[in-house]
């Protein structure tokens, strides 16, 4: 099995990249893909860049050039579920856009025209993440992750998202685009991110301070998932 792992930012991929054996680098379209082996599993690690367009371009390049069997999206997220604290884990059951609106044509909020309302994560990958969460004794929430081209900072955008998507657990800027591309390519995916900030009026300060914590925690999860896949081969 070949696993594609996607992070948006340098801080979100550097720990994993440094662990890859026999690493090679492919640069395309402003993205970097690092291939090799990690924990006995063939891996293609993408640094996509920030935002939905960068994530979609990078995911497409990753799928076309490396043809991974599954995709894991790692990195940081802003927590909206009250049970989430800095460093906790959020696992996608589904992902949606929070900044898409074609409701005038009968679509649901966040649903792109001619697309599903949500992009649903793979059950087996969710189960794998759950197994690793249990073995690592981490606090985690599973549910809806919403994506948009905005860093959510302040009461007004936060209230809008919560009103529109009452079940939302976390927000970030790439996961729905990654899920969208995986849907188009019929490739199983899951989003496993660590909380860098709790989405409120001070979230930009928290993000800067705790991004490294989120990077360590999300890397810990990816390593555990790869190690489990290696044992199950």
Swiss-Prot record:
InterPro entries (alphabetical): MTA_SAH_Nsdase (IPR010049), Nucleoside_phosphorylase_d (IPR000845), Nucleoside_phosphorylase_sf (IPR035994)
- What are the EC numbers? 3.2.2.9
User: Can you provide one Gene Ontology molecular function annotated for this UniProt record?
Assistant: methylthioadenosine nucleosidase activity
Q: Name the residues that bind substrate.
A: 78, 152, 173-174
Highest taxon listed in the record's lineage: Bacteria
Gene3D superfamilies the UniProt entry points to = Nucleoside phosphorylase domain
- What's this protein's name? 5'-methylthioadenosine/S-adenosylhomocysteine nucleosidase
